Amino acid sequence: MNDNLDLFSGAAPAAPESGAAPDKVLAKVQALRAQLNQWAHEYYVLDTPTVPDGEYDRVFQQLQALEGAYPELVTPDSPTQRVIGAVLDGLMPVRHAVPMLSIRTETDNEATGAEAFDARIRKELELAEGAPPVEYVAEPKFDGLAMNLRYENGRLVQATTRGDGEVGEDVTHNIRTIRKIPLSLPEGKGVPPVVEVRGEVYMGRADFVKLNERQQAAGGKSFANPRNAAAGSVRQLDSGIAAQRPLSFFAYGLGEITPAAQGGPDFVTHYAMLQTLRDWGFPVAPQVCIAKGAAELVAFHQRMGAERATLPYEIDGVVYKVNSLAQQRQLGFVSREPRWAVAHKYPAEEMPTRMEGIDIQVGRTGKLTPVARLAPVAVGGVIVTNATLHNLFEIRKKRVRTGDTVVVRRAGDVIPEVVGRVPGDRPAYVPNFRMPAACPICGSAVARPKGEANHRCTGGLFCPAQRKEAILHFAARRAMDIEGLGDKLVDQLVDGHVVRTLPDLYRLGLVALASLDRMAEKSAQNVLDALEKSKKTTLSRFLFGLGIRQVGESTAKDLARHFGQLDAIMDASVEQLLQVRDVGPIVAESIHTFFAQPHNREVVEQLRACGVHWEEGAAREQTAQPLAGMTVVLTGTLPTLGRDQAKEMLEAAGAKVSGSVSKKTSYVVAGAEAGSKLAKAEELGVTVLDEAGMLALLAGGDR
């Protein structure tokens, strides 16, 4: 290190005098930060360290000491602030300034799929047969977590997950801990006042293995794959935990950015934008390259497929993007997906291994699922020891028995499944597998309902396996939304016989909760507060939370709108239930059977007695349905209403909310960044409304 950076050598700084820090100290702090940022960039991004770790640590400690002596000099982008030890109560939702749209994934996963994409692009651009090849940027498709990094005046101010594309979660406290992500951008390199950099947070293969080794040594839970490890780390409330996880980042695009007319960069190509991101200190995948025409895209697909298993991080495919930004604008979007880009996934990876046995898992609805217990095998960089066999009929169809050598596939590169048996000798005297007659968890009888392939435990909420899953489902965000009631807490509550039924949740006390492992008084009070808050809900959320088989979120809303009151639903006949939109015989029978059980009715009444309530409404037949029979499409970002909120309002008025525009569409409600749906509506002559127009329509205004 240069001598002029040594403000003091090993000794603590002198006690500061009152008032602002001296100019000499400020200059030295800025110099130390610049040097540390440069070394960190060389080490974490360029992989070419120029100083020993000890030298970096020594300068880092000098900066820490100076900031400790002069706390007014501490800034959020200082290298010392990557880990601030903050523990949040929850992740805050953030609406994206520019929606994080997804790229269409082709079902054709062969390299030749690139030829079809290129042909489609040339047709859309109306290029003649002899015209020069289209220039693309070819990129690996990372298997991680999409992230939006917002910088204002060169400083990282917010990091947000993709979420549903419109609204994500603020995870800035954790993203600051990732060394490959710069906290500040360099001066003098054309960084605009506002820029959002988008990319993928991931965990390398070797880092993933080491993390699981540490987890196992500490008695913790291992992660199934690097993507789950990365996603779980990013969504931690405690940044100290995230800081211990070896996360990395690759940049691949932009969100909101200061326009060129206001001093922002004027990019001509996607590749030039990526090169600029490199110059600003962001890591960009080294495999990214320009490909001219279909032949070079095919070659890239084949090259990445051959290198895939040896890469230090997981990829599950490749992405092709038209390089010219002018051509991107010309191509536009369709169904909120860019026409100018496509993803091609590689086929699922398969490996042989020995099936050592078949275990039974009992799910939330009582379904018994046979699971193959396997000799450990690496499939796509993940050690697989279990794989689903789905049901008895699948086992018979695949003709697998204990002791067989079977082929295991990671379907979608995530879920392991047994594909089939490898022909050859099998051990003698191995009988065919039979489903148990009694539930392995509670001992209740097992039955297979008529017309179904699945066997089920008849124990209901009395079965601990169903009890845990039923409680977790009841507490889920889209059901009763009981924050803090997660897997580990539910395990303790059920295993400790503290909670046996759903109403028991609302009878919990502070002393009982606080006495559980890893549950301090403050955490216990937070759970109690969340339970109290959840008592005021909606009929559709309550119905969904009960976990009735075949009743998802949409069906629960339809039931609530049709009947208006819970008692009417509970007393409805199968014939009456069949009058509800999208409810068929199987769903109607499931609902009727659920409420015919005395113990289920008792649970409902006890929940009401505990204070769970909602606003009862009139039945649909008695309620005005101004938009009955109409189809409405939502597109873009509305000024004050979220997409889910607008959808609920429209559906409550009898409209069907569709995801695509056609001649049968009655209205298109358009907000900012409306895209191709708006263009399609104008082309077909469909009436377009803004948010105010939609509200007027709902209020009974002119159609």
Swiss-Prot record:
Any one biological process term the GO annotation gives: DNA repair
Reaction(s) the record says it catalyses: NAD(+) + (deoxyribonucleotide)n-3'-hydroxyl + 5'-phospho-(deoxyribonucleotide)m = (deoxyribonucleotide)n+m + AMP + beta-nicotinamide D-nucleotide
- Residue ranges of the region described as Disordered: 1-20
- List its EC numbers: 6.5.1.2
Q: What SMART domains is this protein classified in?
A: BRCT, HhH1, LIGANc
Cofactor(s) required for function per UniProt: Mg(2+); Mn(2+)
**Entry keywords, A to Z:** DNA damage, DNA repair, DNA replication, Ligase, Magnesium, Manganese, Metal-binding, NAD, Zinc
EC class, as a word, reads ligase
Q: Where is the composition biased (Low complexity)?
A: 9-20
Which residues hold Zn(2+)? 439, 442, 457, 463
Enumerate the transmembrane spans.
none
Q: Which InterPro entries match?
A: BRCT_dom (IPR001357), BRCT_dom_sf (IPR036420), DisA/LigA_HHH (IPR041663), DNA_ligase (IPR001679), DNA_ligase_AS (IPR018239), DNA_ligase_CS (IPR033136), DNAligase_adenylation (IPR013839), DNAligase_N (IPR013840)
GO CC terms: cytosol
Q: Could you say which residues bind NAD(+) here?
A: 53-57, 102-103, 139, 162, 200, 321, 345
One molecular function GO term is:
DNA ligase (NAD+) activity
Outline the extent of the BRCT domain: 622-703
Positions annotated as active site in the UniProt record: 141
Q: Which family does it belong to?
A: Belongs to the NAD-dependent DNA ligase family. LigA subfamily.
Please give the function described in this protein's UniProt entry. Answer: DNA ligase that catalyzes the formation of phosphodiester linkages between 5'-phosphoryl and 3'-hydroxyl groups in double-stranded DNA using NAD as a coenzyme and as the energy source for the reaction. It is essential for DNA replication and repair of damaged DNA.
Name of the protein in question: DNA ligase
**Originating organism:** Delftia acidovorans (strain DSM 14801 / SPH-1)
Q: What is the taxonomic lineage of the source species?
A: Bacteria, Pseudomonadati, Pseudomonadota, Betaproteobacteria, Burkholderiales
